[in-house]
C-alpha cells in the first residue's frame, strides 16, 4: 500500500532487462493487489501533470512475462504500462484508476 512517495517514475511492480538483449523466460506477475501509486510531485521541477507512478510496468526489453489476474487501484499515471518489451501475456487484470489505461488495453477499466 502506497509507493513512489519519495521518488517517482516507478511502479508497484517493475521489471526491466535494460539495454542488454538478454532473454529471461518464465517470469510471472500473478494475483497481486497494488494500491496507491501516489507519485512524488512536490519538490520536483516538472509540471504537476507528469505523475509517473504506474501499477505494473514492463520496461526496456522485459521478455516472456505473464501478467495475470492482478488488481491495481489509485495510481497517479496508469494501472499498467508496457514500454519496449517483447513476448508478454497480459490477461484478466482489473484497474481502478483516475487517469485511464496505457494503450495496451490489458486491463478491464472500472
Region roles according to the model:
Residues 7-21, 44-59, 74-78, 102-110:
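Extracellular beta-strand/beta-solenoid scaffold signature
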Amino acid at each position: 500500500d502506497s509507493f513512489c512517495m519519495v521518488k517517482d517514475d516507478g511502479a508497484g511492480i517493475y521489471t526491466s532487462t535494460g539495454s542488454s538483449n538478454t532473454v529471461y523466460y518464465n517470469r510471472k506477475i500473478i494475483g497481486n493487489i497494488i494500491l496507491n501509486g501516489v507519485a512524488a510531485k512536490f519538490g520536483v521541477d516538472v509540471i504537476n501533470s507528469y505523475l509517473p507512478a504506474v501499477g505494473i510496468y514492463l520496461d526496456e526489453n522485459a521478455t516472456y512475462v505473464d501478467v495475470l489476474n492482478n488488481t491495481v487501484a489509485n495510481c497517479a499515471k496508469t494501472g499498467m504500462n508496457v514500454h519496449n518489451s517483447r513476448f508478454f501475456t497480459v490477461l484478466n487484470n482489473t484497474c481502478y484508476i483516475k487517469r485511464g489505461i496505457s494503450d495496451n488495453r490489458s486491463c478491464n477499466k472500472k
